[in-house]
Amino acid sequence: MGKVALIERLTDGTACQGDDCAVVDAGNGLLTLLTTQTLVEGVDFDMMYTPLKHLGYKAVAVAISNIAAMNGHPRQAMVSIAVSNRYSVEALDELYAGVRLCCERYDVSLVGGDTATSRAGMVITVSVRGEVEASKVVYRHGAKTHDLVCCSGDLGSAYAGLLVLEREKVTYQANPDFQPDLDGYDYVLERFLKPEPRMDIVKKLDEAGVVPTSMTDVSRGLADSLLHLSRASRMGCEVYEERLPIDYQTSRVCSEMSKNMLPVSCALNGGEDYELLFTVDQKDYDRIKEMEGIHIIGYVTEEGMTPVMVTPQNTTITLRAQGFQGVEE
């Protein structure tokens, strides 16, 4: 059973809507957005190559990304940690330095949290409260036929960074005298270790007067996110491989790892890019076509259809969530 199916099972009969955040009417035309993210050592991060300051920053950033995915603005955060006695007070100071740095960058007030003892590694949970005008909230559902499918930034680079770190880790474990050489990989490493929520895109869309018809963030790969929007809106979509934004460093890492590793596979199934995937009405085309950092990658098809990708050879491929915790059961 995948993550989404498990959540649906556990929340059956509750008010949960299956979006990136819970939504509560705050009155005065505002909605409150509530989200929680948990990162577990050995599952979501590896302390062999994760600086604690980066980890603290990332934990807050990925929670803020959920707020961005609903077109909102983050306001307050709470951070809770469970740690074993192998972490010193100085180490936790470093972790919280990253937490505070991310909060300061995105004008979020750190208002509380909790600490607990862990018998194994570290667990960090971040809850963020945000706000959005009721007229501007964007859900995963809402896409309609002929809407444009758009994404921000580039895709697959975070996974490329993970591949580099795992390669160096394996080499180091085989030879402890080995000194990792990470020169030339700065971009993909930062994309994995220190992602940035795309609040800048939320701002650009607002300034242009564009409210997406549906939106989510790309946390488990483009294919998974497309399936989320398609399933929620009950619509299909068609995206074009040649339009997927992939950085040259991602392509370089793929060629180094294996001749059979394709950059498009990293984009579709890599995850942790935390870019925004959204749909807009065709009437907004002129407003977004030249907008820096936004790429039109396809369009919404008909009700009941599935997401597909068209290759440069004009072959149509049905998209499936290949990664761990995909949308499928």
Q: Predicted segment positions?
A:
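Short helix-loop capping/hinge motifs at secondary-structure junctions, enriched
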Residues: L30, E133-V138, Y285-D286
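Glycine-rich anion-binding loops of enzyme active sites
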Residues: L39, R75-E168, Y299
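Polyanion-binding loop/helix "lid" in catalytic or ligand-binding cores
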Residues: Q179-H228
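Short, compositionally biased
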Residues: G161-F178, L182
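Glycine-/charge-enriched secondary-structure boundary and capping motifs
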Residues: M1-L6, R86-S109, T117-I124, R129, ...
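Extreme N-terminal cap/leader segments of soluble proteins
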Residues: M1-P51, M70, V79, A97-G98, ...
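Glycine/charged-rich beta-loop-alpha catalytic/anionic-binding loops adjacent to active sites
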Residues: V40-Y49, E131-V132, L182-V188, G209, ...
